[in-house]
C-alpha cells in the first residue's frame, strides 16, 4: 500500500520520560492536597482520578507521544489507566507506570502523588506493595520540588535520607524493578 505524503511530515512516535498524568501543566500549589487525596480514596474518588488520568494519557497520544514513563500519580491511577489501555478498554500511549511515588514527611508530593516513608523498613514495604500492584518502576522523591517550595532555591533541598533511599532501591532491585528519582540538586 502506498500513501501519498506529499506536503506532509512523518515522524516516529515520541517518548515522554516524565509525566504526572494528574498535572495540567498549569502552576499549582500543593496546599492541602494530601487531605484531598484522603477524601478521594474511595470507589467514586478513584473513578474520578482514573477518568482525569485517562484524559491526560489520551492527550499525550494525540500530541504524538506513543510511550510515557509516569513519574507518580495519586491512588495508583496510572497503573489502572495502563491496564485499561493494555486491555483495549481505553486508548492511550504505552505507559511505564510507577504508581504512587515514595517520599518522606514534608517531602515533594507527600500525600498527593507520593506515599510517605518514615523509616527504611517502611520504604522497603512500600516498594513491595507497589510491586504487588504491578508497578513497572519505583519513583523516589529525594529532594524538594518546585510546587512545594516555600522560598526561592528550596526545591533542591535534600529531603530523603540515604538510608531510606538505599532501602527502597535495594528492595526494588531485589524484585527486578528499576528505580527513578526526583532530584533537583547535586546534594540529592
What residue ranges belong to the model's regions?
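Divalent metal-dependent hydrolysis catalytic cores, especially in the metallo-beta-lactamase
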Residues: 52-78, 92-103, 135-149, 177-178
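Histidine-rich, glycine-flanked metal-binding segment
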Residues: 1-11
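Mid-domain alpha/beta scaffold segments of enzyme catalytic cores
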Residues: 70-114, 121-126
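Divalent metal-coordination and catalytic microenvironments
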Residues: 7, 15-18, 64, 95, ...
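Residue-level marker of alpha-helix boundaries and capping positions
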Residues: 47-48, 72, 117, 159, ...
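Active-site gating loops and adjacent loop-to-helix segments of metal-dependent hydrolytic enzymes
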Residues: 23-49, 91, 99, 103-111, ...
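Histidine/acidic residue-rich metal-binding segments in metalloenzymes
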Residues: 80, 121-188
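Metal-associated gating/positioning segment near the N- to mid-region
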Residues: 9-84, 108
